A protein has these predicted regions:
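Extracellular/lumenal glycan-associated context and N-glycosylation machinery
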Residues: 1-57
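An amphipathic, basic-hydrophobic helix/alpha-beta surface used to engage anionic
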Residues: 37-284, 327-331, 345
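Short, structured coil/loop segments at alpha-helix boundaries
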Residues: 6, 22, 26, 95-96, ...
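Detector for methionine-enriched segments
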Residues: 1-3, 20, 42, 158, ...
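Membrane-proximal, solvent-exposed terminal domains/tails of membrane-associated proteins
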Residues: 181-428
Length: 428
């Protein structure tokens, strides 16, 4: 908080005519002293009053949101002093992309003015709302006042959740060795899910409704064990990513991880969902269930940044902590097979992997994921190739930061009603 003299001209004129009055007394000099000195005193007192009596309060409804949510902020500018603030410049130091609350406004003496600002949260991440700097001054521009308000709050923008109807997760603990055995004679006809027909599958395991719907053969994945935990392993090694800006494989991987976690926890098919990622900071969230855990996963994904740990090393390190008979969902843009030995080693613990390959060619890279998908197919590991088009899905889940939503069977999000708690919360 400071008050600054913008120009020395007025004080200089005042002292000059004061000196002239001392050297050559005259009523003219006296009048000029009164005029210049009075103006100097008045503007100084005016600025001092603004410095002492201007206050700004910032309030938000939520301190977390999801991509696509609307951020609304309320500002209250108070001037309880005896003079008006003919102009007040508000400088916003928020870091949310595409959002600025900066403006110029005036406020009368002993009065209050309130306004709102709005923005759409377009990018996941952790941002700050506030602080704020107020600049004002007297109407003649002799003095300026600058007031810094440090109050701020953290806004977490979590990734969107999108429907993934074609991704089917291999159930964990199949027959004790982590993989389905399609030729075992004692399999039942109770199917937990389906996968593409592979060489060696028994024709009697063909799932005809899915085959007819998709135009190619699908086999039943039989439920040989109770629902197991899901571990989502997200590869954010910066050396294997493709794409530019916010349309890249890191963002697609984060969205896929968020969507799978949301799907698993809402369907309550797995006992719990865990998250493993090694970016600039390691994320290790053991499998749990419930809404609180879902939000914890989304917050961790919101803060995730690419690191330098290769997928093979991440799987080797994580192996002893994953437990047995679980479903492991690997999300990666790596098209080199150097991490596959680390993955196959986990099969002997009863870990059933499902691999989501993000096709780098859809992000402008020269190579695609087809060759690696073929290697995984030979090993009998379910794999899905996903591309850049998922980032443009209009059905992206807009979250609960501002409204409450329901998802239609087609995956479209429809607002149902505002959330019950719409109270304003002050920054600070």
């Amino acid at each position: 908080m400071r008050m600054r003299l913008n120009s020395v001209l007025l004080p200089l004129l005042t002292f000059t005519v004061l000196a002239m009055q001392l050297l050559d007394p005259s009523k003219i000099w006296q009048a000029l002293i009164a005029a210049f000195g009075g103006l100097w005193l008045m503007t100084g007192l005016w600025a001092w009053s603004l410095k002492a009596h201007l206050r700004l309060t910032r309030e938000v409804r939520f301190t977390w949101a999801q991509v696509g949510d609307a951020l609304e902020e309320q500002f209250t500018l108070v001037n309880d002093g005896p003079v008006p603030a003919t102009w007040v410049e508000i400088i916003d130091h928020s870091t949310l992309p595409g959002y600025s609350a900066a403006r110029a406004i005036g406020v009368d003496n002993s009065s209050t003015t309130t306004w709102h600002t709005n923005a759409i949260c377009k990018r996941r991440g952790v941002y700050e709302l506030g602080g704020t700097t107020l600049r004002s001054g007297d109407p003649f521009g002799i003095y300026s006042v600058e007031i810094f308000l440090p109050e701020k709050t953290t806004l977490v923008v979590m990734p969107p959740v999108i429907p993934l109807p074609t991704v089917e997760i291999m159930p964990g603990g199949w027959m004790g060795d982590g993989r389905p055995r399609p030729n075992i004679m004692d399999q039942t006809v109770n199917a937990a899910t389906v996968r593409e027909f592979a060489h060696g599958d028994s024709p009697r395991l063909i799932h005809w409704p899915t085959t007819a719907r998709r135009g190619k053969f699908y086999s039943r994945q039989l439920d040989g064990a109770p629902a197991s935990d899901w571990w989502i392993a997200l590869d954010v090694d910066a050396n294997v990513q493709a794409g530019e800006g916010w349309e890249n494989t890191v963002e697609l991987g984060v969205i896929l991880a968020a969507s799978l976690a949301d799907r698993g926890l809402r369907a309550r098919h797995p006992q719990g969902v865990g998250l493993l990622a090694s970016g600039t900071q390691t994320v290790w969230l053991k499998p749990q269930s419930g809404e609180r855990h879902r939000l914890e996963i989304l917050r961790s994904l919101a803060m995730l940044e690419p690191g330098q740990l290769p997928l093979a090393e991440m799987l080797d390190r994580a192996g002893p902590t994953l437990g047995n008979r679980i479903s492991l969902i690997v999300i990666t843009a790596s098209i080199k097979p150097d991490w596959i030995p680390a993955l196959t080693h986990l099969l002997w613990k009863g870990i059933s992997p499902t691999v989501l390959l993000m096709d780098p060619s859809s992000f402008g890279a020269s190579q695609n994921a087809d060759a690696l998908a073929g290697v995984l197919a030979e090993l009998g590991i379910p794999r899905f190739i996903l591309n850049r088009s998922l980032l443009q899905q209009p059905e992206a889940h807009p979250g609960k930061g501002h409204w409450e939503w329901r998802i239609t069977p087609s995956g479209k999000a429809i607002s149902t009603r505002p959330p019950s708690d719409l109270t304003w919360k002050r920054l600070g």
